[in-house]
Amino acid sequence: LQKITTVAPSTTATALTSLTTGKPPGEHGIIGYKINVGNQLLNSLRWTTGRGAVVNDIDPISFQPVTPFIGEKVPVVSPMEFSESGFTSAHLRGADYLGYSMPSNMPQIISNSISQGYRLVYSYYDGLDKVGHIHGLGTYFNAEIAMIDFIVGQILETLPSKTGLLVTADHGMVNVDNSVIQINNEILQQTNIISGEARFLWFHPTRGCETNLLIELNNLYSEYAWVRSKEQILDEGWFGRQVSAQARERLGEIALLAREPVAFIEKDRPGPKLIGRHGSLTE
């Protein structure tokens, strides 16, 4: 096993798009889980806003302009339920999508693709992420890792000689459980919208409140989190050396990133109760 560093933010949509395009978030533009698009929050995994599905209103191909897999037609072995999603169009377009209904199908579908002469096959399994969110790191998580190890073993048995298998995670996770901090009402009153997720939040301030909001966030939460302005983050290259104008526009003005195993939520929009969470920069 080799320890690697994922992208910022360490979240599924951002990391998977970097895997399939070879580009950092600042270039591909999927800069987080919930992204501000015209003062509405796009859930980048579900490609929905508060109005429901928006695949016809927010074009995935325009939103994420980098061609996946450098334009090669690659078989993608992934859960069947994702085959026609907006996010799939954004980060897997042009691929030959081979959906599986059960994880046990993966080895055979991969083997069939290789036997047809494909030089690269891409596969995705989301079970460990789900278990981590629901149960956290521990016995359930370890049991799921054992399940993955079995699947990997089955894949290895089907591969012809001189075929390599690379297994990687898209991000890590920490146990948060009930360590949840409700964002102060005075902060919310100075904020137009909050994008991102509970361990990497972007604040989009109301006009004239940016400086005061930065100070107050530091005063309230610096014990638990990093507070950075957008310019600091861009100058330090968190999203890569090149950040497109399109990606830059989607960022808020101030970022709040959990340093401790905590989550930040809005009282009126707490989201699902999760034990394991990701999104920040911690190991």
Give residue spans per PLM region.
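Feature captures the catalytic ectodomains and active-site-proximal regions of enzymes
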Residues: 1-283
